Amino acid sequence: SVITGAVSAVIGFFSFRLRGIYFGVGTIAFAYVIYIIAQNWVELTHGPMGIPLVPPLRLLPESVGVVGRDVQTRIAVVSTIAIIIFGLDRLLHSPIGRAWHAVRENESLASSLGISPLHYQMAAFVLGAVISGLGGGFYAHYVGFISPTELGFHYIGVVFIMLIAGGAGTLPGPIIGSVVFGVLPELLRVAETARNLLLGLILLFCIAVVPEGLTGIWNRLRPERKAASDRPSVATVPGVAAEIVSPATQTGELKLGGVFKRFEGLTALSDVTLNVQPGEVVGLIGPNGAGKTTLFNIITGMLAPTGGDVFYCNREIGGLRPYSIAALGVTRTYQITSLFPELSTQDNIRVATHLRSCRSVLAALLRNKRFRDSEAAIDQTVDRILQLVRLQSRCDLPASALSYGDQRRLEIGLALATGAGLILLDEPAAGLNAEETDELCDLIRRLRAAGFTIIVIEHDMRMVMGLCDRIVVLSLGRIIFDGTPTAAAAHPDVIEAYLGTETADA
């Protein structure tokens, strides 16, 4: 298991540079290389002849003959499986498991919330390899023989079928898949010639009809949990108001000095210099293509600047990874809503509390006091944020089932849950009606009063003028104005950028 884990770490180091289907192809290619090496390294593996006479597993000395060797092996296997399932269940119901789910659903969003995708992908990859290596060791002792053919594509395909048919991304899925596809071949022996065809048809059925696997059928048929709307919402109880949250990280000045960003021959940002003080609400406006979202991407680490400096709290953040910048107290929302669609509303927010949580593997397994206190505090934070963004009555709904306006509010809830002191909102009022926009403005004012620093990209000029302390205007990648909303409304360069030269002259 240790050797398997070490080898998987090396393979993962190279494979995780790939994305999507290329990652799968890359890992299969590595498996095939190992298979070829095992087939041809005769001195170590005996080649196709394999290694015979592997001694059976013994838990008790030979002098104790009460329990046979086969029974001892079965006891060891069952006990190990039980321990692994218990441990995995605890990990999956902890910040570690939430991070795995987040990276699987929306890697870029997870990164902006302070979760390192590569760290958690590698951890899952190595853990899976260690468990597989342990299973291979038990198999060798039970059968008494090791052959390189066990590494062939046939066995890789069987494991893949078990995973897909059972349900990927769940703990019961692979267990159900392994049981079903361990029993099915025996049941189908009566149709020996058509057995592989029938197994293939079952797999195609799962992919086409129930892509989430056999566990998905259970999830569809089981009684739905009681809807959150049937429970009393604290936000709707008379005399109880949603308590504003405060930044969990220190807040400080954001300084941009001479920032440039070039994409091959295109200059998206040119000599952008900007200072944002703690507790300010700054509106970043400009025509489409002015470079507003590009500037957000640079501040939050989605893009590295071509030149210039970006400092937050007197620390250089330009070029850092998004999760590193989030850990320093900077997060954002997106122009196009970005959530974890399959997770419930409250679980979306719970994922976003990652930086506040106890992320120790040992604590997650033991459920010690530190872990329990951390999870209790997170539950309270989630409840407060649900009240604050007025989504408590929809807390059990998946994010994909929320209305567009609710999804926008949930995005802000995710940003608040990180504990960041600087929040960048990219067109938060897009698609909202006038009443929802007013509610959003009220929320932003309350956040400013609580100590948050907020930069808003917005095209709703009524909202910007009534909400922001300062207005910064970008045009063609340059700042053409930085001042009060009143001065911005009368500035000729701002009018020209929005309305055109002829209208400005008129």
Name what the model sees in each region.
Residues S1-V234:
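Transmembrane alpha-helices and adjacent helix-loop boundaries
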Residues S1, G65, R69, F86, ...:
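Residues at structural and domain junctions
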Residues G47, I51-P55, L60, R222, ...:
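Intrinsic-disorder/low-complexity coil detector
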Residues T249-K255, F260-A506:
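Glycine-rich phosphate-binding loops of nucleotide-dependent enzymes
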Residues V54-R58, G97, G213, V240, ...:
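Intrinsically disordered, low-complexity segments enriched in proline/serine/threonine
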Residues M49-P52, I202, T215, R231-T236, ...:
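Compositionally biased, intrinsically disordered low-complexity regions
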Residues G68, Q72, A76, D89, ...:
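Alpha-helix initiation/capping motif
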Residues I217-F260, T503-A506:
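ABC-family P-loop ATPase nucleotide-binding domain
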